[in-house]
Regions:
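Bacterial N-terminal signal peptides
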Residues: 7-14
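Structural signature of tandem alpha-helical TPR/SEL1-like repeats
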Residues: 45-53, 82-91, 118-127, 154-163, ...
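TPR/TPR-like (Sel1-like) alpha-helical repeat modules
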Residues: 198, 267-290, 319
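Canonical positions in the second alpha-helix
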Residues: 57-58, 94-95, 130-131, 166-167, ...
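Short helix-capping/linker turns of helical repeat alpha-solenoids
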Residues: 30-31, 35, 47, 61-64, ...
Length: 323
C-alpha cells in the first residue's frame, strides 16, 4: 500500500512539474528543494508524520505549490491522519493558484461538489478550463458534465460530447467512463446504449472497475439481445474483484441465483462460496440499506446449507479483500 501511494504521488508530482514549467507566467518557487526531497524520502519510507511536516514547511514558508498539492493528498487519502475533504480542497486551491494543472482539476471538483465552499458550477468550470488548457484533458469531461446537466450553464449535450471525446479517444479510462455514462444516462437527445457499451468496453480493456459494472448493467437490461446470466455475472464479478463496491451485491446475487446442480438441486460449491463472499462484502461496504437487507436475507439462506467448516477460510478471504 505504501509503495502504491508513493508511486502515485511521484507520478502526480512529475506530471505537475512538467506542465507547470510549460505554463507561461507561472513562477513556482524551487526554493526548499532539500525540504521537498526529505519529504519525498520520508513518504517513500512510510514516515507520514515527518513527510507531512516537511511538506508543510515547504508549503507555508516557501509557498511551494507542489508541496501544497501534496498536503491536499494527505488529507484526501488519509495518509497518517483522518480523511478531511474540506482541508484537502483548501490545499488544492492554494496549489491551483500556483499553476499546478492537477490541483486546478481537483479544485474544480471541490467547487463542483461543494466540499469546502457552497456548490459553484461557474467557479468549478473556471478551474476545469484552466486545467484542461494546461494539458489536463480529462478536465474537459467534468466541464462537459456541467453542460450535459445544465448546472450553471445552458444545456448543450452535443457540445458536452465534443469536449470529452478527445481525452477518451487518447486513452484516458476516466474520460472513457464519462463518455459511456453520457451515452447511457445523459440527456435523452444523445442517449445511445450501443455507444455507451462501446466506451465501457474500451475502458474495461484497461481494467477500469466501474466499466465492468456498467457493462453488466447494460447486458442485464438489453432487450435487443438476451445475454446469458453467466456473461452478466462475469462482468459484475470482475468489477467486484477490482473492489468496485456497487458490484458486490450484484455479483453475490447472481451467484446466489445461479442454476443449481441438476443432481443435487443445490448450488455448486464454487457458486455457494462466491455468493457468500460477495454478499458478505456488500453487507460490509454498501451504503444502500435495501441492498444490505437483501444481502443479509440471502446470506441466511446460504448459511443454512453451507458447511460451517468453510466459514473461517471464507471470512479470512473477505477480510483480506477489503483491506
Amino acid at each position: 500500500m505504501k509503495k502504491a501511494l508513493w508511486a502515485l504521488l511521484c507520478a502526480v508530482i512529475f506530471l505537475s512539474e512538467a506542465w507547470a514549467d510549460k505554463v507561461s507566467g507561472v513562477n513556482i518557487q524551487r526554493t526548499g528543494s532539500l525540504t521537498m526531497q526529505d519529504a519525498q524520502d520520508a513518504l517513500a519510507s512510510g514516515d507520514y508524520a515527518k513527510a507531512f511536516n516537511q511538506y508543510h514547511d515547504a508549503a507555508v514558508q516557501g509557498n511551494n505549490a507542489l508541496a501544497q498539492f501534496s498536503l491536499g493528498l494527505f488529507f484526501q487519502n488519509g495518509w497518517g491522519r483522518e480523511i478531511d475533504p474540506a482541508t484537502a480542497c483548501r490545499w488544492f486551491e492554494k496549489a491551483a493558484q500556483g499553476g499546478i494543472p492537477v490541483a486546478q482539476h481537483s479544485t474544480g471538483v471541490c467547487f463542483d461538489e461543494g466540499i469546502h465552499h457552497a456548490e459553484n458550477p461557474v467557479t468549478a468550470a473556471h478551474w476545469f478550463r484552466k486545467a484542461a488548457h494546461a494539458g489536463h484533458l480529462y478536465s474537459y469531461c467534468h466541464l462537459a458534465n456541467l453542460l450535459m446537466t445544465g448546472r450553471g450553464f445552458s444545456k448543450n449535450p452535443v457540445k458536452a460530447l465534443e469536449l470529452c471525446h478527445p481525452a477518451a479517444q487518447q486513452g484516458s479510462p476516466p474520460a472513457q467512463l464519462w463518455m459511456g455514462k453520457f451515452y447511457l444516462q445523459g440527456d435523452p437527445a444523445i442517449r445511445n446504449q450501443r455507444e455507451a457499451y462501446r466506451w465501457f468496453a474500451v475502458a474495461a480493456q484497461k481494467q477500469a472497475p466501474e466499466a465492468f459494472y456498467y457493462l453488466g448493467l447494460i447486458m442485464q437490461s438489453d432487450s435487443s439481445r438476451k445475454h446469458a446470466p453467466k456473461e452478466i455475472r462475469q462482468m459484475f464479478e470482475q468489477a467486484a474483484a477490482l473492489k468496485y463496491v456497487p458490484a458486490y451485491f450484484q455479483a453475490g446475487k447472481y451467484f446466489h441465483d445461479a442454476e443449481p446442480n441438476p443432481e443435487t438441486g443445490q448450488l455448486s460449491a464454487e457458486h455457494l462460496a462466491k455468493a457468500y463472499l460477495w454478499l458478505s462484502a456488500a453487507t460490509h461496504q454498501s451504503q444502500d440499506p435495501e441492498e444490505i437487507s437483501a444481502a443479509k436475507s440471502m446470506l441466511q439462506q446460504i448459511l443454512a446449507v453451507m458447511p460451517k467448516t468453510w466459514l473461517a477460510e471464507l471470512d479470512q478471504k473477505i477480510a483480506q479483500h477489503l483491506q
